[in-house]
């Protein structure tokens, strides 16, 4: 992979540095209820202020669709961010234009200005060249620190980079460095755990992973489709019968590349999908027509643990069962605890990502034990699919514009 341009390589002293951050935080009644994403931006902001930069923050919040929606104003973020920084955060009520430019010009070295929600402008999500140019007037150079938005070619993530020297912030660097280490140049053997409801949402992911990992375990509802393609009856389970050919192509690709493809061998069954119904543990070949597969069984988890023991790197995306409904969280929780223990006590590099995955690891109480957890949903998935992310491509290679 081409090297990314890092903010440490730029001369930022006295310059207006535009930083694209992810401040799409949970809010209730105008109050930030979870400051995790604000905290993630602190290292880059503090690095720049200490280096004497004038920091101008760009972010989106919600989906206002190009209109000014007062409830989606980023002004509510200013005080929580100021509290975390221990310093004032100024706010521009407009996203671009003379007043916004004037606000950036008024900054002293080491001060921070937050620009209003970029999605209040219709040109943000359409990557309008005119709006991108207007945003570029707010700074002398640009830093992307929002991996979670890097898969979107928007004005504040891609268009702006055609006007300013562009670099990766510290949080973005951390994401990329860990993902490159896990997928592009990993310690081998590599095992990937992929779960979730539908194969259709992760076809590209599976097709990319079988070419890059040594072992691929598929769980969750996705596994039902692969089992069905092998001629195994899955009863009334969620199953995409129209994807049999796709599933068989994945098996063939795995065999061709020498990737061992693992599926559940025993399963937890129920006739109703509800919390704590009557369940039955059975071999995967012993599913009745009126039963649903809702989790992997204990023998499968043991086999998965043994496969993890044989691996040096683990990549995890998606739960292994219907984890949000007990008791069908058991396999996911047990596998997560096993992987976490291997990461803490052994030398396993354990990387996970995706919204459901993060929730599952939090539920298992092991988030802090994984080597790295990406909170980016779509961007993490697209990276794992081997796709080029516009926001990343924009900060790679030799800069066309030099600060």
Curated annotation (Swiss-Prot):
InterPro entries to which the protein is assigned, alphabetical: Phosphoglycerate_kinase (IPR001576), Phosphoglycerate_kinase_CS (IPR015911), Phosphoglycerate_kinase_N (IPR015824), Phosphoglycerate_kinase_sf (IPR036043)
Catalyzed reactions: (2R)-3-phosphoglycerate + ATP = (2R)-3-phospho-glyceroyl phosphate + ADP
Keyword terms, alphabetized: ATP-binding, Cytoplasm, Glycolysis, Kinase, Nucleotide-binding, Transferase
Source domain of life: Bacteria
Keyword Transferase found: yes
A cellular-component GO term for this protein: cytosol
Protein name listed in UniProt: Phosphoglycerate kinase
Gene transcribed to yield this protein: pgk
């Amino acid at each position: 992979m081409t090297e990314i341009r890092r903010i440490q390589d730029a001369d930022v002293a006295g310059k207006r540095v535009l930083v694209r951050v992810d401040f799409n935080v949970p809010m209730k009644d105008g109050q930030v209820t979870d400051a995790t994403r604000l905290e993630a931006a602190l290292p880059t902001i503090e690095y720049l202020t200490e280096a004497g930069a004038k920091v101008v923050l760009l972010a989106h919040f919600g989906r206002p669709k190009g209109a000014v929606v007062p409830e989606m104003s980023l002004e509510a973020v200013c005080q929580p961010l100021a509290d975390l920084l221990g310093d004032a955060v100024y706010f521009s009520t407009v996203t671009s234009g003379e007043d916004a430019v004037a606000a950036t010009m008024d900054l002293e070295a080491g001060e921070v200005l937050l620009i209003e929600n970029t999605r209040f402008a219709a040109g943000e999500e359409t990557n309008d060249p005119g709006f991108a140019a207007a945003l570029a007037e707010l700074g002398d150079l640009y830093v992307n620190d929002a991996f979670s938005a890097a898969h979107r070619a928007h004005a504040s993530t891609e268009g702006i980079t055609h006007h300013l020297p562009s670099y990766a912030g510290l949080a973005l660097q951390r994401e990329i460095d860990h993902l490159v280490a896990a997928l592009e140049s990993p310690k081998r053997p590599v095992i990937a755990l992929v779960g979730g409801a539908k194969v259709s949402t992760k076809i590209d992911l599976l097709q990319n992973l079988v070419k890059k990992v040594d072992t691929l375990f598929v769980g969750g509802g996705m596994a039902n489709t692969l089992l069905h393609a092998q001629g195994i009856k899955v009863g009334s389970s969620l199953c995409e019968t129209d994807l049999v050919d796709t599933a068989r192509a994945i098996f063939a690709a795995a065999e061709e590349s020498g990737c061992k493809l693992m599926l559940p061998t025993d399963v937890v069954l129920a006739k109703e999908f509800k919390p704590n119904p009557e369940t039955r543990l059975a071999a995967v070949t012993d599913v009745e027509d009126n039963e649903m597969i809702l989790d992997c069984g204990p023998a499968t988890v043991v086999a998965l643990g043994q496969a993890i023991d044989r691996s040096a790197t683990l990549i995890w995306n998606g739960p292994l069962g219907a984890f949000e409904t007990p008791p069908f969280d058991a396999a996911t929780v047990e596998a997560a605890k096993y992987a976490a223990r291997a990461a803490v006590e052994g030398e396993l590099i354990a990387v996970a990502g995706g919204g459901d995955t993060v929730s599952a690891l939090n539920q298992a109480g092991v988030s802090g034990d994984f080597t790295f957890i990406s909170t980016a949903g779509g961007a993490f998935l697209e990276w794992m699919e081997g796709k080029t992310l516009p926001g990343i491509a924009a900060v790679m290679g030799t800069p066309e514009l030099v600060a």
